[in-house]
Amino acid sequence: MKLLRFADILLIYAEAANMAGSGPTQLAVDRLNSIIDRANEGTGTEPRATLAMTQAQFDQKVIDERSFELCFENDRYFDVLRKRLLQEVNLPDNADGYDENDYLLPIPALDALSIGQNPGYE
């Protein structure tokens, strides 16, 4: 059973609010900053999110914060796949690097009978 921590819910909200519009909303910034402030105990050592950030900058800030906040909770792998970041965060294991098939997971066998299997898992 997957348990969600409140910090994860706030990060999901901040990311969704940012991606649903054309950039971060005040509420999304506040949610992200509440996690940053709690983690740093208000020391001001971590740069906070602002409304001046572009959508891409805020998205990167959320992804970075997810990697800090949720480390060792097995979420990073799926964030990397979802955001298509394999090439940026991993050293290439081979000279060819990664292709689009590396971002796909296998479809369960019973479902694959009716809808087919993802490339690379046939």
Where are these regions (language model features)?
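Acidic/polar-rich alpha-helix caps and helix-coil junctions
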Residues: 1-122
